[in-house]
């Protein structure tokens, strides 16, 4: 059979990588984002604006909450589909925060179990990307770190929850080799006490700052200043993509504020 896989994912798509592995195991020919006639076409869509209804089987966050059949979900990803040089997968899917601005609660994936990295890691790689939505909610999070240390892997990740940070978790982060920045987040002002306590003990990293949701400009400036004072770098996440939010993001990304005594003074002078 000739199988075509379609997606609007800009980098990689784990579901399609597993579908590819499944069909290649049956000696099918697999193509990615080709145009033509095929025996079967799968599509996984991330964005609402993408054209739908052009594949035999469609899924993904922009379509529905459907999941892969067990026989496909259990496959190791086909890393040749995107010519990746790192492993990709989940050791723990859930995040129990239920934040209204986040898509994770809406997806509501039924898999709540811990998984070993060896369910998806290819030992030929020395890097691994964890797609976990909240690693430290996993009661067995230590096992994940121990497997990574034993395999001497460099880690890419989607962020660690500062509200769950204690000395033990912070020490695990310090012992881990990361590729690029470690990522954290400060979305809500009501979490300030726990966020600041976490930022004081974790390794230096990049902190996602949600703006335009339920915070004021004054609170956005305040959060960025606190993050900088604790030797981390803020990274603005515009919620509504408004002109003001995008301008504030450009301001923080420009690092021109480093020339000033504080963020507030720099923002007053920012003209772009």
Residue ranges and their predicted role:
Residues 211-215, 235-272:
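Flexible glycine/acidic-rich beta-alpha junction loops that bind and position SAM and/or redox cofactors
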Residues 42-46, 103-199, 204-213, 233-238:
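Core AdoMet radical
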Residues 1-4, 85, 98, 127:
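Residues that mark the start of a beta-strand
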Residues 1-55:
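A short, structured N-terminal alpha-helical element that caps or precedes a catalytic domain
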